Amino acid sequence: MSPLAQKKVAHLKRKTRVRKKIRGTTDRPRLNVYKSARHIYAQIIDDVTGVTLVSASTVQDESDALKYTGNVEAAKCVGAMVAKKALEKNITSVVFDRNGFLYHGRVKALADSARENGLSF
C-alpha cells in the first residue's frame, strides 16, 4: 500500500472512531469541520433530523476579502462566521466534531474563534 493510501486509511479510522462517540442532538447540534488544502468548511448539523442548520466556509462571499483561504487566518474567519450565524438561529451550545483531523493548526484556530464569538463546547 502506498504512503498516500495508508494516510487515507488512517484518517478514515480516526474519523470513524471520533464519529462513533459524538452525536449531535436538537439541543446541542454537532459542529463539523472539514479542511482541504485550499479551503476550510464548517457545518452545524442536527443528527436527529439529519439537517444542516448553519454552514460557513472560505468559498462563500463573506470570505472574499481573504488573500489566502487555506491558512489559519482563514480558519479564524470561518469560525467567527459560523458562530455569528449560529447565534442568529439561537444556537449557543454545540458538540465539536473534528472529523478525524488533528486538533491543531487550522482546526484549533476555527474552534477557538467560534468559542471567542459565543459558541460553547
Curated annotation (Swiss-Prot):
Keyword Glycoprotein tagged: no
InterPro entries documented for this protein: Ribosomal_uL18_bac-type, Ribosomal_uL18_bac/euk
Keywords for the protein's UniProt record, in alphabetical order: Ribonucleoprotein, Ribosomal protein, RNA-binding, rRNA-binding
Keyword Hydrolase belongs to the record: no
Domain of life: Bacteria
A Pfam family the protein falls into: Ribosomal_L18p
GO BP: any one term: translation
GO cellular component term of the entry, any: cytosolic large ribosomal subunit
GO molecular function, one term: 5S rRNA binding
Xref: NCBIfam families: L18_bact
Family listed: Belongs to the universal ribosomal protein uL18 family.
Summary of subunit composition and partner proteins: Part of the 50S ribosomal subunit; part of the 5S rRNA/L5/L18/L25 subcomplex. Contacts the 5S and 23S rRNAs.
Function of the molecule: This is one of the proteins that bind and probably mediate the attachment of the 5S RNA into the large ribosomal subunit, where it forms part of the central protuberance.
Name listed for the protein in its UniProt record: Large ribosomal subunit protein uL18
Lineage, top ranks: Bacteria, Pseudomonadati, Thermodesulfobacteriota, Desulfuromonadia, Geobacterales
